[in-house]
A protein has these predicted regions:
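Acidic/polar, compositionally biased interaction segments
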Residues: 1-101
């Protein structure tokens, strides 16, 4: 992820079931559910959870997304926003298991 502005970015996962999002160094090594920027863990229907982090413009930040499906309904969307940028979809599709997306 390469931010276009230096400011606080809020990342959202909306998932059925669990999803986690890490950004920066934790996305590469040492990632655990307890240090995820967004921890949307558990067995549940579509639930949106968010986390915020200050990012510097034109700097590369690796992102790791982990998703788990327990049965029944399913889906995952990842979005971000800032105080000056409306909510945008980070992934261009709604991700579903067994579809390759």
């Amino acid at each position: 992820f390469i931010p276009t502005t230096t400011e606080t970015y809020t990342f959202y996962t909306n998932s059925d079931d669990a999803s986690y999002l890490w950004i920066g160094g934790n996305a590469l090594t040492g990632y655990t559910t307890s240090n995820a920027l967004v921890n949307n863990g558990g067995i549940h229907g579509m639930v949106e959870v968010s986390g915020s982090i200050k990012l510097k413009a034109n700097t590369y930040y690796p992102i790791r997304i982990q998703y788990g499906q327990g049965g029944g309904g399913l889906g995952l969307t990842i979005n971000y926003s800032t105080p000056t940028i409306s909510k945008n979809q980070l992934l261009p599709v709604v991700c579903k298991p067994h579809t390759g997306l």
